[in-house]
Amino acid sequence: MDTHAPYDKPKRTPRLPRRLRPLRLLAAAATAALTLTAGLTTPLNPAPQSAQAAADDGKDVLTVAVAQSVDSLSPFLATRLVSTSIHRLMYEYLTNYDPKDNRAIPGLATKWEPSADKLTWTYTIRDNSKWSDGKQATAEDAAWTFNKMMTDDGAATANGSFVANFREVTAPSPTKLVIELKKPQATMAALDVPIVPKHVWENVGDFSKFNNDRTYPIVGNGPFVVTDYAADSFVRLKANTSFWRGAPKFDELVFRYYKDQDAAVAALRKGEVSFVAGAPALTPAQAASLEGEENIKVNDAPGRRFYALATNPGARAKDGEKFGDGHESLLDQQVRQALFMAVDRKTIIDKVFQGYAVEGEGYVPPRFSTYHWKPTDGQKLSYAPDKASQLLDEAGYKKNADGKRVGKDGKPINYRILCHATDPQDKAVGKYLQEWWGELGIGVTLNCLDNVTDPWLAGEYDLAFDGWSVNPDPDFVLSIHTCAALPATPKDTGATDNFICDKRYDELYGKQLAEYDAAKRADLVKQLQSRLYDTGYMNVMAYPNAVEAYRTDQIESITTMPRDAGNIYGQDGYWSWWSATPAAVGEASEESSSAGVIIGIVAGVVVLAGVGSFFGMRRRASAEDRE
């Protein structure tokens, strides 16, 4: 959970994500931003000194400017990429991803193996991982985490799809975890769930409301420990010197929220921040302005996100009750496909992204070639406004004397599109939609909000700009379109992205989840994308590049993922921030940083018995995005 992306539990607010359906943080927490210490630079109180100099005790501080605020510090609730990225730094997962090629490698588990029938999986839990309060991390912590998700709907909010097929989870010993399945599950080496300390979390009452932001430092066993947090302002972490892979090289890591991304870029120029991620990437203008700047490096890499228009298919809950106010014409597949054909993707790539993106088609970006899908020539809904107009006529939505397309109620059709107020791409594409769909006789109202979550969850929209960070194993971002992801009742928060519930899609989803053969599963995932494309519910317009920048006089070296032409922010792992070397050290090169990552990886051994090439598959790790 982009997703999950989610810009992660791949962007999602619903796009400012990896993952699903955050609960609102207490508004009062935002006032904490006004009481920051003098040594901390914030958008509300910028300081002239560099990010590293901001720590008056001489510590090396890496400050990351982000375009998302944290939705929750609880790994059971968080869906935004910034939140799930922080959770990867706070907690270990059973497995991790190799930063070179995305293959499954040891995390909290040193090895894992299935039974002959693939229904029982045994994980060996490492004995050298400790919680930051000094207690040993054990298999009991993992078993408790999974069991809580299996028995508490609140704890299953973000990542419940991973445990839905679990029959029983036990910890026969401190280093042995056993998971019994109801039926085969191909994601058992890709369980993207943060493992939490039982002795801390067993004291939590309502998991649906607890945001893990009451006591600091927050107990974890990842490379960093959260020491402070102010809503809509910052998250501060310190290096975990007892981390089993070795301590990070930076003493502190700060994620600082900037609503205005031009201000974030300006802060990078001044040296007030070390790194800027963008919203979720730098705009072409921002990237161009930084190219050639002294001590600044722009990283432009193929992205793991898709950028889409999500259609409200008629919001409903599992209990069958309908809610929201989506336009009734969008229930017609022919109308949805007509809207597809009235979107010029080439113009969006050339004019909006200015080449920093690839034209969208399937749900999984081309970066993940195993699962990437393209429609056939006869299937592709190419830009053809005349054909789109014809489809609308055939569907019974014709123009009146004023040239306005009218609905079955005789009123002119006007679609409300949810738009992220902080995302310039949303606004730019929205203007094109007003032009293109206006030629069809359809009105468009852009509803650009700081918080799109509330109307989205309420089903009070017609279409919405959407996007998730997809992971090497795309199961999570596929699961959010199943009927099982719908909320139990209209008052509940489900894992669904945009209320899709399609029987054929569900059948294909179940088949891919149970398929251990890598090639057969990849084919089923492509069939899923084909089905999603044909329904017209998700119009993937682009795959944006990961465009980001950092100061080379503050960061000597940092690991990208994948190693060749990869991103830094929002990785499927903690490699970037864990490996980052302060420029003041001056001895580490990019190669030595990467070597450190390799050394940390080969310390573990993966048992592949009985599964063949399955573990060689690229798997999911975050939205994101989880997002």
What name fits each language-model region?
Residues 2, 34-36, 230, 304-307, ...:
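Detector for C-terminal structural segments
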Residues 57, 124, 158-204:
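Surface-exposed binding/hinge segments that line
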Residues 63, 138-145, 178-180, 222-223, ...:
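Alpha-helical secondary-structure segments
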Residues 65-116, 147, 217-219:
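N-terminal lobe/hinge region of extracytoplasmic solute-binding protein
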Residues 66-87, 108-110, 135, 188-196, ...:
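A structural "hinge/loop" feature
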Residues 110-155, 178, 255, 264-267, ...:
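Aromatic- and charge-enriched surface segment that lines or borders ligand/interaction sites
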Residues 156-159, 168-170, 227-241, 254-322, ...:
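Extracellular/periplasmic solute-recognition and catalytic clefts
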Residues 193-248, 252, 385, 390, ...:
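Gly/Pro-rich hinge or "lid" segments in bacterial periplasmic/extracellular proteins
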